[in-house]
Structure formats: structure tokens, C-alpha cells
């Protein structure tokens, strides 16, 4: 996922959800502004919610916001004015907790029966081809730019991969395991590509922006882990993208004033390759490095209790340990690649056709070689070579997708929309589409809402509900990010962080006491 992370990595979406249809745009804006004012006075000049993090009406002598005067504390104190101002955000929190309750009911109770997974290659292919055909005929849109790897294109790429990834889980389509590994590698590639593009071009290393990225990757999964008592690594996409995002961020943050130097960027990438090699391939280093984080990154499958708790994290993170660096490389050379494809576009028709034909021929030969050499390997053998070869199919796809102006200028909107919610669909599938029943259980069964003799109708109903809820989670995550993670006031951000930590500690103590009492 999406999960995900600038570029095609982890889209933030609109800063304020457009889902609150029962209110006018002015009412929505006023409510969010008032709520933010209870956290810190809104910047009346810009009117931008992301800037609404200035000084509160009640501040200390130095102009800094007092902890007791932030909106959350005033709400806890029963301040009617603060509660009224925060009504939309409180409604968002209430909706979030209701969704978590739905997760619990579907996956931890016997309210709905479980169904057995059944794979039909014919049905699997038919679903995807039908969706793709509909997308091509009904939702083909022109991009805002014809640049290679533009935002719409990467969202589309994530979208169709996510559809296949989810169908793979739903039907247990083990025969496409190697393809799924490549899809996940492509997501990780986008982490390197998107984050490098953002930090290298915009040079925005602010704590606020970084915190918003961490919120996007981890906010919802944290609540799911708490509500369902699951380990963080069960949703391995989230910690994996978080780790590689941290690598990209800090590698560019160090000596950031020299990031305009090609030699410095090359040196940083070489250092990253060496670092990754040492961590994952020198025996013992991984264990020592991540030992302090074992409390967070350990995972025990109930069906395999004797496996080392850190094995899952080592395996998952190690499969794609290099490809995010390749994403950084691609982002760095992207301007030259864009200049090349535009140079080809400007050639006379005859010359352009020859060049594009040559590109397609070489790319096709490379694809055939990769397929017959690596893709056809059995699962375990493929896993061994995957970390070193996943960049090949990614490059092949990029070249095919961008070889002509027409190919770069259009995208399939329905897949683009799917690509925006990859992180949410990834997390939600475990509990309201599939079923595991126990903490840390792998989702080996299906959620059943209809009688067993209607598997196709059950699939359609569950999918409609599941996608709708995932879309709402995406919107809620962004709505709450606006209020809770200010991006221009580090003092206010730190107060919110202190409050959040205190709240989680308090809830943890209360929950432990409740469990002991039961």
C-alpha cells in the first residue's frame, strides 16, 4: 500500500473531505476553521486549513500555545464552545470508532459466518478483464500532463495492481504469487520514487510535512491493531513503507544543502546500497539493529507459534530491500528521461516510428528473457532472486507505458480511484472482506453475508461494502490529519503529540485494567 507513500506513493487526497454532503461548502470550511481555532487561531489571510496553526487566543507570555488551551483539552474539560466548534471532527472520530466496531463484529464474533476460499482461474480473469474493459470504454480520461510517470499514471498503476492483489487474496490464486511479489515491489519502488521526487524538488524537510506522511501511513493501522489486538507486522506493508520512507527522508536530509550536486546524490545512493547490504545480508546485523524494536516489529502467527517472532519482519522487509533505492535512482534521472521521450515526440513521423519500434522491440526481448529466466521459477526459488531482479519488470512496464505521447496522455480513471485507497483497502480486507477470527491470524477464510449457495452474490455484496468503507477511511484519515497534524507550527504539533501519547497510555492502562477485571 499503500500502501502507501509525493509522486505515486501515498496520496494525501483533498485536505478536507468532500463527503459531508449535508453541509454547504461554507459551513464545512467554517466548522473546520473554528475547530482549528480551538487548537490555534486560523491564519485569516490564507484561509487554508493547513495553515491554521497559529497562536491561540489564550497563550503564554512568549506567544506559544499552552497545553491546557489546545482544543482537545478544552473538549475534555467540557467547554461547550470548543465542542460546538469541533462538531465535524468529533463526528469523524465517532465514525472512525464505529468502523472499528464493524471490523470487530465481522472478524471477532460469530455474527456472520465464514466461507471457504475457492479459486477459479476463469472467474478470476473474467472479473479483472470486465473491470478493465469497463474502465477503458467508460472512464478513459486525458491526463493533465503528458510527462512520463505523472500522478494519474502512477495512481492508475497502483489501482490495477491493487485489484489483482486483492483478488489474489480473495480467491487464493497462488499461481500468480510471483506477479504479486512484483506488484508489492512496484509499490515500494514508488515509495523511493515519490519521496525522492518531493524532497529533492521541493526541499521541504519540515517536521509538519514529515509527520503528515507518517500519519498517512500509520494512523488507521494503529487503531486497528489496538482494537483487534493484532501485531503491527500483520499489516506488513505499513511498517515496510514507513521504514523505507524514513531511509529516503534522512538520506536526503543529511547535507541537504548539497543535494543539487550529482556527485553527492550518487554518493548517498551508494551508501544506501552498502547500508542495506550490511543490514540484510551480513549475518547478525539485522537482529542486533532491530532488537530494540522487537516489541513493535515482532509477529507470531497462531498457526506457527514456534517461528522466530522477528522472522516475518526480516522476510517481508528483505524481499524489497533494494527496489526503493532504484525508485530514488529513477526519480533522479526522471528529468533526463522526460527530455528523451519529448525529443522522440518531436521527431518527424518516420524517424519517430523507427525509434519507438526499436524501443518496443528491445523491451519485448527483455521482457521475454526476464519471464523465461526468472518469473517462471517456483515460489521459493523466485523469492531468492526477487530482491535483485524486481527492478527489471518495473523498468519494462515503465517503458511500455510511456513509449508514446498517446500512451502517456491518457489514464483509466476507475483504476486511478482504486489507486488512491490502496492503503485502506489493504488494511480493511483482513476484517470486512476476508476473515481471520483470532488475533494475528492470517485471513484464510471469507466473510459471509449471504447463504453459502450464493458465492458470487456474496462476493459482490461484500466487495461493495468493503470498498465503500475503505473510501470513507481514506477521507476520515485526511480530515483528522488536518485537525491533528498542523504542518506549520512545530510547537502546536508537539503539544498534539504529547496529548496523543498521554491519551494512548491512559487508554492502555484502562484497557488492561478492564481485561484483568474480566
Predicted regions and their residues:
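Long, hydrophobic alpha-helical transmembrane bundles and adjoining juxtamembrane helices/loops
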Residues: 1-3, 7-518
Amino acid at each position: 500500500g499503500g500502501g502507501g507513500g509525493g509522486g505515486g506513493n501515498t496520496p494525501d487526497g483533498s485536505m478536507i473531505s468532500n463527503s459531508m454532503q449535508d453541509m454547504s461548502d461554507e459551513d464545512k470550511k467554517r466548522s473546520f476553521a473554528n475547530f482549528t481555532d480551538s487548537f490555534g487561531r486560523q491564519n485569516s489571510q490564507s484561509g487554508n486549513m493547513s495553515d491554521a496553526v497559529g497562536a491561540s487566543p489564550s497563550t503564554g507570555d512568549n506567544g506559544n500555545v499552552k497545553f491546557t488551551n489546545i482544543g482537545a483539552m478544552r473538549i475534555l474539560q467540557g467547554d461547550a464552545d470548543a465542542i460546538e466548534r469541533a462538531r465535524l471532527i468529533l463526528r469523524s472520530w465517532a465514525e472512525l470508532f464505529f468502523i472499528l466496531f464493524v471490523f470487530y463484529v465481522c472478524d471477532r464474533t460469530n455474527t456472520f459466518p465464514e466461507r471457504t476460499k475457492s479459486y477459479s482461474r476463469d472467474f478470476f480473469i473474467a472479473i479483472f478483464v470486465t473491470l478493465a474493459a469497463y474502465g477503458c470504454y467508460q472512464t478513459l480520461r486525458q491526463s493533465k500532463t503528458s510527462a512520463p510517470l505523472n500522478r494519474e499514471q502512477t495512481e492508475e498503476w497502483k489501482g490495477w495492481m491493487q485489484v489483482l492483489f486483492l483478488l489474489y487474496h480473495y480467491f487464493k490464486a497462488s499461481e500468480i504469487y510471483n506477479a504479486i511479489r512484483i506488484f508489492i515491489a512496484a509499490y515500494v519502488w514508488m515509495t523511493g520514487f515519490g519521496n525522492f521526487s518531493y524532497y529533492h524538488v521541493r526541499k521541504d524537510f519540515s517536521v509538519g510535512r514529515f509527520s503528515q506522511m507518517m500519519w498517512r501511513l500509520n494512523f488507521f493501522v494503529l487503531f486497528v491493531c489496538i482494537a483487534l489486538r493484532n501485531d503491527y507486522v500483520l499489516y506488513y506493508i505499513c511498517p515496510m513503507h514507513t521504514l523505507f520512507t524514513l531511509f529516503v527522508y534522512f538520506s536526503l536530509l543529511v547535507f541537504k544543502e548539497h543535494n543539487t550536486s550529482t556527485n553527492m546524490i550518487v554518493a548517498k545512493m551508494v551508501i544506501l546500497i552498502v547500508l542495506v547490504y550490511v543490514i540484510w545480508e551480513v549475518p547478525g546485523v539485522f537482529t542486533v539493529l532491530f532488537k530494540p524494536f522487537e516489541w513493535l516489529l515482532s509477529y507470531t502467527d497462531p498457526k506457527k507459534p514456534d517461528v522466530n517472532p522477528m522472522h516475518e519482519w526480516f522476510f517481508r522487509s528483505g524481499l524489497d530491500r533494494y527496489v526503493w533505492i532504484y525508485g530514488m535512482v529513477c526519480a533522479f534521472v526522471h528529468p533526463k528521461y522526460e527530455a528523451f521521450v519529448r525529443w522522440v515526440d518531436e521527431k518527424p513521423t518516420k524517424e519517430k516510428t523507427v525509434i519507438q519500434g526499436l524501443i518496443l522491440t528491445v523491451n519485448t526481448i527483455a521482457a521475454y528473457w526476464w519471464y523465461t529466466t526468472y518469473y517462471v521459477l517456483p515460489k521459493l526459488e523466485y523469492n531468492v532472486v526477487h530482491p535483485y531482479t524486481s527492478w527489471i519488470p518495473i523498468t519494462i512496464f515503465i517503458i511500455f507505458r510511456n513509449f508514446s505521447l498517446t500512451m502517456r496522455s491518457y489514464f483509466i480513471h476507475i483504476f486511478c480511484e482504486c489507486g488512491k485507497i490502496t492503503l485502506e483497502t489493504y488494511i480493511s480486507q483482513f476484517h470486512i472482506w476476508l476473515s481471520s477470527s483470532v488475533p494475528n491470524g492470517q485471513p484464510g477464510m471469507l466473510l459471509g453475508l449471504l447463504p453459502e449457495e450464493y458465492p458470487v452474490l456474496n462476493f459482490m455484496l461484500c466487495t461493495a461494502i468493503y470498498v465503500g468503507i475503505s473510501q470513507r477511511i481514506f477521507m476520515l484519515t485526511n480530515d483528522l490529519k488536518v485537525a491533528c497534524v498542523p504542518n506549520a507550527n512545530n510547537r502546536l504539533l508537539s503539544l498534539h503529540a504529547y496529548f496523543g501519547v498521554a491519551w494512548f497510555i491512559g487508554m492502555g492502562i484502562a484497557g488492561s485494567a478492564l481485561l484483568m477485571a474480566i
